[in-house]
Amino acid sequence: MASTTPEVKPGTTLHLLAGSSAGLISAFTLQPFDLLKTRLQQQQRANVGYRSSISRELKKLARFKDLWRGALPSTLRTSVGAGLYFTILSQTRTYVAQLRARTDKLPHSQTSVLPKLSALDNLSAGFVVRAVVGFITMPITIIKTRFESNMYNYNSMYEGVEGIYLDGKEKGSLRNFFKGTIATLARDCPYAGLYVLFYESMKNEFVPKTLILFDQQEQLENSTLVNSSAAVVASSLATTITAPFDAIKTRLQLDSHTVGGNSIMSVTKQLLKEDGGVRNLFRGLSLRFGRKGLSAAISWCIYEELLKSGRLQRLLH
Protein backbone atom coordinates (compact mmCIF):
# COMPACT_ATOMS: atom_id res chain seq x y z
CA MET A 1 0.00 0.00 0.00
CA ALA A 2 1.40 3.38 -0.94
CA SER A 3 2.14 5.72 1.93
CA THR A 4 0.63 9.21 2.04
CA THR A 5 3.49 10.53 4.15
CA PRO A 6 5.62 12.94 2.12
CA GLU A 7 9.15 11.70 1.47
CA VAL A 8 11.82 13.41 3.54
CA LYS A 9 15.05 13.70 1.61
CA PRO A 10 18.22 13.02 3.64
CA GLY A 11 20.21 16.15 4.43
CA THR A 12 23.94 16.72 4.07
CA THR A 13 24.59 16.00 7.76
CA LEU A 14 22.83 12.65 7.50
CA HIS A 15 24.86 11.69 4.42
CA LEU A 16 28.09 12.65 6.23
CA LEU A 17 27.16 10.75 9.41
CA ALA A 18 25.92 7.67 7.56
CA GLY A 19 28.97 7.58 5.29
CA SER A 20 31.45 8.05 8.14
CA SER A 21 29.77 5.36 10.26
CA ALA A 22 29.77 2.91 7.36
CA GLY A 23 33.42 3.62 6.58
CA LEU A 24 34.53 3.33 10.20
CA ILE A 25 32.87 -0.04 10.74
CA SER A 26 34.08 -1.57 7.47
CA ALA A 27 37.65 -0.26 7.85
CA PHE A 28 38.20 -1.66 11.34
CA THR A 29 36.51 -4.98 10.58
CA LEU A 30 38.47 -5.61 7.40
CA GLN A 31 41.88 -4.19 8.38
CA PRO A 32 43.59 -7.65 8.27
CA PHE A 33 42.86 -7.84 4.53
CA ASP A 34 44.60 -4.51 3.92
CA LEU A 35 47.62 -5.41 6.05
CA LEU A 36 48.21 -8.73 4.29
CA LYS A 37 47.68 -7.18 0.85
CA THR A 38 50.23 -4.45 1.54
CA ARG A 39 52.82 -6.99 2.68
CA LEU A 40 52.28 -9.14 -0.38
CA GLN A 41 52.79 -6.14 -2.66
CA GLN A 42 55.88 -4.68 -0.98
CA GLN A 43 59.31 -5.39 -2.41
CA GLN A 44 61.13 -8.36 -0.88
CA ARG A 45 64.58 -6.82 -0.58
CA ALA A 46 66.30 -9.50 1.49
CA ASN A 47 65.89 -12.20 -1.15
CA VAL A 48 65.13 -11.31 -4.76
CA GLY A 49 63.91 -14.83 -5.54
CA TYR A 50 61.67 -14.99 -2.47
CA ARG A 51 57.94 -14.99 -3.17
CA SER A 52 55.68 -14.20 -0.30
CA SER A 53 52.25 -15.71 0.29
CA ILE A 54 49.34 -15.15 2.65
CA SER A 55 50.33 -18.12 4.82
CA ARG A 56 53.97 -16.96 5.04
CA GLU A 57 52.92 -13.45 6.02
CA LEU A 58 50.56 -14.82 8.68
CA LYS A 59 53.38 -16.89 10.18
CA LYS A 60 55.52 -13.74 10.53
CA LEU A 61 52.96 -12.13 12.84
CA ALA A 62 53.86 -12.48 16.52
CA ARG A 63 50.35 -11.85 17.85
CA PHE A 64 46.83 -12.09 16.51
CA LYS A 65 46.23 -8.39 17.15
CA ASP A 66 49.12 -7.56 14.78
CA LEU A 67 46.61 -8.14 11.97
CA TRP A 68 45.10 -4.82 13.01
CA ARG A 69 48.36 -2.87 12.81
CA GLY A 70 47.57 0.39 11.06
CA ALA A 71 43.92 0.27 12.14
CA LEU A 72 44.01 3.85 13.49
CA PRO A 73 45.15 5.58 10.27
CA SER A 74 42.99 3.17 8.29
CA THR A 75 39.81 3.99 10.22
CA LEU A 76 40.62 7.71 10.14
CA ARG A 77 41.18 7.63 6.40
CA THR A 78 38.14 5.52 5.62
CA SER A 79 35.68 7.19 7.97
CA VAL A 80 36.66 10.69 6.86
CA GLY A 81 37.01 9.62 3.23
CA ALA A 82 33.74 7.69 3.16
CA GLY A 83 31.88 10.51 4.88
CA LEU A 84 33.16 13.03 2.35
CA TYR A 85 32.72 10.66 -0.59
CA PHE A 86 29.12 9.69 0.15
CA THR A 87 28.17 13.29 0.95
CA ILE A 88 29.77 14.87 -2.12
CA LEU A 89 28.61 12.02 -4.35
CA SER A 90 25.02 12.41 -3.17
CA GLN A 91 25.08 16.17 -3.68
CA THR A 92 26.70 15.77 -7.10
CA ARG A 93 24.20 13.17 -8.27
CA THR A 94 21.28 15.22 -6.99
CA TYR A 95 22.62 18.30 -8.76
CA VAL A 96 23.11 16.40 -12.02
CA ALA A 97 19.62 14.92 -11.77
CA GLN A 98 18.12 18.37 -11.27
CA LEU A 99 20.28 19.85 -14.01
CA ARG A 100 18.99 17.27 -16.47
CA ALA A 101 15.42 17.68 -15.22
CA ARG A 102 15.10 13.98 -14.44
CA THR A 103 13.93 14.09 -10.85
CA ASP A 104 10.27 13.87 -11.81
CA LYS A 105 10.69 11.45 -14.71
CA LEU A 106 12.94 8.98 -12.92
CA PRO A 107 11.58 8.09 -9.46
CA HIS A 108 13.76 6.73 -6.66
CA SER A 109 14.43 3.03 -6.55
CA GLN A 110 12.31 1.02 -4.13
CA THR A 111 15.49 -0.11 -2.37
CA SER A 112 17.25 3.28 -2.27
CA VAL A 113 16.66 6.93 -1.43
CA LEU A 114 19.33 8.08 -3.89
CA PRO A 115 18.51 9.69 -7.26
CA LYS A 116 18.63 7.60 -10.43
CA LEU A 117 20.95 8.73 -13.23
CA SER A 118 22.13 7.46 -16.58
CA ALA A 119 25.08 5.08 -16.81
CA LEU A 120 27.40 7.84 -18.05
CA ASP A 121 26.29 10.21 -15.27
CA ASN A 122 26.94 7.55 -12.61
CA LEU A 123 30.37 6.78 -14.08
CA SER A 124 31.35 10.45 -14.28
CA ALA A 125 30.05 11.35 -10.81
CA GLY A 126 31.90 8.49 -9.13
CA PHE A 127 35.12 9.26 -11.02
CA VAL A 128 35.24 13.00 -10.24
CA VAL A 129 34.17 12.75 -6.60
CA ARG A 130 36.71 10.01 -5.90
CA ALA A 131 39.47 12.19 -7.37
CA VAL A 132 38.62 15.04 -5.01
CA VAL A 133 38.33 12.87 -1.90
CA GLY A 134 41.39 10.79 -2.84
CA PHE A 135 43.59 13.87 -3.06
CA ILE A 136 42.30 15.22 0.28
CA THR A 137 42.98 11.94 2.11
CA MET A 138 46.32 11.14 0.42
CA PRO A 139 48.55 12.01 3.43
CA ILE A 140 46.69 9.64 5.76
CA THR A 141 46.70 7.00 3.00
CA ILE A 142 50.52 6.98 2.94
CA ILE A 143 50.69 6.77 6.74
CA LYS A 144 48.25 3.84 6.64
CA THR A 145 50.26 1.99 3.99
CA ARG A 146 53.54 2.35 5.88
CA PHE A 147 51.98 1.25 9.17
CA GLU A 148 50.73 -1.92 7.47
CA SER A 149 54.12 -2.71 5.95
CA ASN A 150 56.85 -4.41 8.00
CA MET A 151 59.45 -2.21 6.25
CA TYR A 152 58.75 0.55 8.78
CA ASN A 153 58.45 0.25 12.56
CA TYR A 154 56.36 3.27 13.46
CA ASN A 155 54.99 3.12 17.00
CA SER A 156 52.73 6.16 16.79
CA MET A 157 51.03 8.47 14.32
CA TYR A 158 53.59 11.15 15.21
CA GLU A 159 56.48 8.84 14.26
CA GLY A 160 54.71 8.05 11.00
CA VAL A 161 54.22 11.71 10.11
CA GLU A 162 57.81 12.59 11.05
CA GLY A 163 59.23 9.58 9.21
CA ILE A 164 57.42 10.39 5.98
CA TYR A 165 58.25 14.10 6.20
CA LEU A 166 62.00 13.41 6.56
CA ASP A 167 62.13 10.50 4.12
CA GLY A 168 63.84 10.10 0.75
CA LYS A 169 65.19 12.73 -1.60
CA GLU A 170 62.47 15.23 -0.69
CA LYS A 171 63.50 15.51 2.99
CA GLY A 172 61.46 18.07 4.86
CA SER A 173 58.95 18.38 2.04
CA LEU A 174 55.17 18.10 2.14
CA ARG A 175 55.42 16.42 -1.26
CA ASN A 176 56.36 13.23 0.59
CA PHE A 177 52.74 13.01 1.79
CA PHE A 178 51.51 12.86 -1.79
CA LYS A 179 53.75 10.11 -3.18
CA GLY A 180 51.86 7.81 -5.50
CA THR A 181 48.99 10.28 -5.91
CA ILE A 182 48.69 9.73 -9.65
CA ALA A 183 48.80 5.94 -9.29
CA THR A 184 46.28 6.09 -6.45
CA LEU A 185 43.89 8.25 -8.45
CA ALA A 186 44.46 6.05 -11.52
CA ARG A 187 43.26 3.17 -9.35
CA ASP A 188 40.54 4.84 -7.29
CA CYS A 189 38.88 7.12 -9.86
CA PRO A 190 38.13 4.43 -12.45
CA TYR A 191 37.23 2.07 -9.61
CA ALA A 192 34.77 4.53 -8.10
CA GLY A 193 33.28 5.44 -11.47
CA LEU A 194 32.92 1.82 -12.54
CA TYR A 195 31.65 0.85 -9.10
CA VAL A 196 28.84 3.43 -9.08
CA LEU A 197 27.97 2.45 -12.65
CA PHE A 198 27.85 -1.29 -11.87
CA TYR A 199 26.22 -0.78 -8.46
CA GLU A 200 23.32 1.29 -9.74
CA SER A 201 22.78 -1.06 -12.69
CA MET A 202 22.82 -4.15 -10.49
CA LYS A 203 20.71 -2.57 -7.74
CA ASN A 204 17.98 -1.22 -10.00
CA GLU A 205 17.81 -3.94 -12.64
CA PHE A 206 19.61 -7.27 -12.30
CA VAL A 207 19.44 -8.05 -8.56
CA PRO A 208 15.76 -7.08 -7.98
CA LYS A 209 14.67 -9.15 -10.99
CA THR A 210 16.59 -12.10 -9.57
CA LEU A 211 15.25 -11.75 -6.03
CA ILE A 212 11.65 -11.28 -7.11
CA LEU A 213 11.65 -14.92 -8.17
CA PHE A 214 11.94 -15.80 -4.50
CA ASP A 215 9.97 -13.04 -2.80
CA GLN A 216 7.45 -10.73 -4.42
CA GLN A 217 6.18 -8.96 -1.29
CA GLU A 218 8.90 -8.27 1.30
CA GLN A 219 10.36 -5.24 -0.49
CA LEU A 220 11.58 -3.46 2.65
CA GLU A 221 13.30 -6.52 4.09
CA ASN A 222 14.84 -7.31 0.73
CA SER A 223 16.37 -3.85 0.31
CA THR A 224 19.36 -4.79 2.48
CA LEU A 225 19.96 -7.95 0.44
CA VAL A 226 19.56 -6.08 -2.85
CA ASN A 227 22.02 -3.34 -1.87
CA SER A 228 24.58 -5.77 -0.43
CA SER A 229 24.42 -8.16 -3.40
CA ALA A 230 24.73 -5.32 -5.89
CA ALA A 231 27.67 -3.90 -3.93
CA VAL A 232 29.60 -7.19 -3.91
CA VAL A 233 29.16 -7.80 -7.65
CA ALA A 234 29.99 -4.19 -8.56
CA SER A 235 33.06 -4.22 -6.33
CA SER A 236 34.38 -7.47 -7.80
CA LEU A 237 34.15 -6.17 -11.35
CA ALA A 238 35.71 -2.78 -10.58
CA THR A 239 38.46 -4.33 -8.41
CA THR A 240 39.68 -6.65 -11.16
CA ILE A 241 39.87 -3.88 -13.75
CA THR A 242 41.90 -1.53 -11.50
CA ALA A 243 44.15 -4.12 -9.78
CA PRO A 244 47.50 -3.19 -11.47
CA PHE A 245 47.35 0.40 -10.21
CA ASP A 246 46.89 -0.86 -6.66
CA ALA A 247 50.18 -2.77 -6.80
CA ILE A 248 51.96 0.23 -8.35
CA LYS A 249 50.52 2.61 -5.75
CA THR A 250 51.67 0.48 -2.82
CA ARG A 251 55.21 0.16 -4.17
CA LEU A 252 55.48 3.92 -4.81
CA GLN A 253 54.37 4.77 -1.28
CA LEU A 254 56.68 2.27 0.41
CA ASP A 255 59.93 2.53 -1.56
CA SER A 256 61.75 5.83 -1.12
CA HIS A 257 64.76 4.84 -3.23
CA THR A 258 63.26 2.84 -6.07
CA VAL A 259 65.84 1.83 -8.67
CA GLY A 260 65.17 3.85 -11.82
CA GLY A 261 63.16 6.53 -10.07
CA ASN A 262 59.79 6.98 -8.40
CA SER A 263 57.39 7.09 -11.32
CA ILE A 264 54.53 4.91 -12.49
CA MET A 265 56.54 3.78 -15.51
CA SER A 266 59.70 2.92 -13.55
CA VAL A 267 57.78 1.00 -10.88
CA THR A 268 55.80 -0.88 -13.53
CA LYS A 269 59.04 -1.93 -15.24
CA GLN A 270 60.49 -2.99 -11.90
CA LEU A 271 57.43 -5.11 -11.07
CA LEU A 272 57.57 -6.79 -14.47
CA LYS A 273 61.30 -7.56 -14.08
CA GLU A 274 60.85 -9.20 -10.68
CA ASP A 275 60.14 -12.90 -10.30
CA GLY A 276 56.51 -13.40 -11.30
CA GLY A 277 56.38 -10.89 -14.14
CA VAL A 278 52.90 -9.70 -15.08
CA ARG A 279 51.41 -11.54 -12.10
CA ASN A 280 53.10 -9.02 -9.81
CA LEU A 281 50.63 -6.40 -11.06
CA PHE A 282 47.84 -8.53 -9.61
CA ARG A 283 49.50 -9.57 -6.33
CA GLY A 284 47.08 -9.31 -3.45
CA LEU A 285 44.08 -9.36 -5.80
CA SER A 286 42.34 -12.13 -3.85
CA LEU A 287 42.72 -10.14 -0.63
CA ARG A 288 41.56 -6.97 -2.35
CA PHE A 289 38.62 -8.94 -3.74
CA GLY A 290 37.62 -10.03 -0.25
CA ARG A 291 38.28 -6.68 1.33
CA LYS A 292 36.57 -4.57 -1.35
CA GLY A 293 33.61 -6.91 -1.72
CA LEU A 294 32.90 -7.11 2.00
CA SER A 295 33.65 -3.43 2.49
CA ALA A 296 31.25 -2.45 -0.27
CA ALA A 297 28.54 -4.72 1.08
CA ILE A 298 28.97 -3.41 4.64
CA SER A 299 29.46 0.26 3.74
CA TRP A 300 26.70 0.71 1.18
CA CYS A 301 24.26 -1.43 3.16
CA ILE A 302 24.83 0.57 6.37
CA TYR A 303 24.89 3.85 4.45
CA GLU A 304 21.63 3.33 2.60
CA GLU A 305 19.83 1.82 5.60
CA LEU A 306 20.91 4.73 7.83
CA LEU A 307 19.63 7.16 5.22
CA LYS A 308 16.25 5.45 5.32
CA SER A 309 16.19 5.35 9.11
CA GLY A 310 13.37 7.61 10.24
CA ARG A 311 14.69 7.64 13.80
CA LEU A 312 18.11 8.92 12.74
CA GLN A 313 16.55 11.58 10.54
CA ARG A 314 14.38 12.79 13.44
CA LEU A 315 17.45 13.06 15.70
CA LEU A 316 19.12 15.36 13.18
CA HIS A 317 16.12 17.62 12.72
UniProtKB/Swiss-Prot annotation:
Q: Which InterPro entries match?
A: Hem25/SLC25A38, Mitochondrial_sb/sol_carrier, Mt_carrier_dom_sf
Q: What is the protein name for this chain?
A: Mitochondrial glycine transporter
PANTHER family in UniProt: MITOCHONDRIAL GLYCINE TRANSPORTER
- Note the Pfam families from the entry: Mito_carr
Query: TM segments?
Result: 16-41, 70-96, 123-148, 180-203, 226-252, 284-302
Tell me which SUPFAM superfamilies the record gives: Mitochondrial carrier
UniProt GO cellular component terms = mitochondrial inner membrane
Q: Does the keyword Mitochondrion apply?
A: yes
Q: Which GO terms describe its molecular function?
A: glycine transmembrane transporter activity
Organism phylogeny: Eukaryota, Fungi, Dikarya, Ascomycota, Saccharomycotina
**What membrane topology is annotated for this entry?**
Multi-pass membrane protein
Name one process (GO BP) from the record: glycine import into mitochondrion
Protein family (similarity comment):
Belongs to the mitochondrial carrier (TC 2.A.29) family. SLC25A38 subfamily.
- The Solcar repeat units are at 10-95, 117-205, 222-309
Could you tell me which species this protein originates from? Meyerozyma guilliermondii (strain ATCC 6260 / CBS 566 / DSM 6381 / JCM 1539 / NBRC 10279 / NRRL Y-324) (Yeast)
